[in-house]
Design a protein with these regions (language model features):
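Membrane-interfacial helix-loop-helix
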Residues: 1-31, 56-148, 172-190
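Transmembrane alpha-helix interface/packing and boundary motifs in multi-pass membrane proteins
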Residues: 30-49, 125
């Protein structure tokens, strides 16, 4: 075991001690994805980054990657759905709220994106940073049919739930391979130096 691997394992062990266990952990991941997708709240919560990190942790034994993906997808869907309902029910009134008023530029960007791409914007908008939570809100306010919204939102949430924790998982696998090959490469260089000296 290399020193770097030992330090990583010790750091992860300490981190795991602070994280909740079992169902509570998956609820936390679901809430993070929910918040990331909720109109306005997603600006404050780095849900994508946290879900990538959770995928990395799953590789190292913190929970099941499959359950993690499901929790992230379900949370993302419900955040979208609530944003859609808020847009349909309260659209302009909610935009008058002091906090959202400061983000009208993002609402306008979401409106333009929705006008250009229609229902597909619900699917693709999830992957466009700051406007992510505003797209479902705008779709609801624009009177998008709920059935069409649900189809795009379910597909988008499933892909997001798979992509972000999956990215963390595969980054961890790649990191392990880099560490393994770095160690071997170092030995080859050392052997070459010994032979030449």
């Amino acid at each position: 075991m290399t020193g770097g691997t030992g330090r990583l394992e010790e750091t992860l062990r300490q981190l795991f001690a602070y994280l909740p266990e079992g169902v509570t952990y998956y609820l936390l991941i679901g809430l993070i994805a929910f918040g990331e997708s909720l109109v306005g709240i997603g600006l404050l919560l780095p849900g994508s980054t946290l879900c990538v990190f959770a995928g990395f942790l799953a590789l190292h034994g913190k929970g099941s990657i499959v359950t993690l993906i499901a929790a992230a997808a379900v949370g993302a869907f419900w955040g979208d759905f609530l944003s859609f309902v808020l847009g349909a029910r309260f659209g302009p009134d909610l935009l008058a709220h002091r906090w959202l008023k400061k983000r009208l530029d993002l609402v306008r960007k979401a409106e333009i994106f929705f006008a250009e791409h229609g229902g597909k914007s619900v699917f693709f908008g999830r992957f466009f940073g700051p406007i992510r939570g505003f797209i479902p809100f705008v779709a609801g306010g624009a009177g998008m049919r709920p059935a069409a919204f649900l189809g795009y939102a379910i597909l988008s949430a499933a892909l997001w739930g798979l992509a972000y924790p999956g990215l963390g998982w595969f980054a961890g696998v790649s990191w392990q391979n880099v560490q393994r090959w770095t160690g071997r490469f170092s030995l080859l260089i050392l052997a070459a130096l010994v032979v030449t000296v």
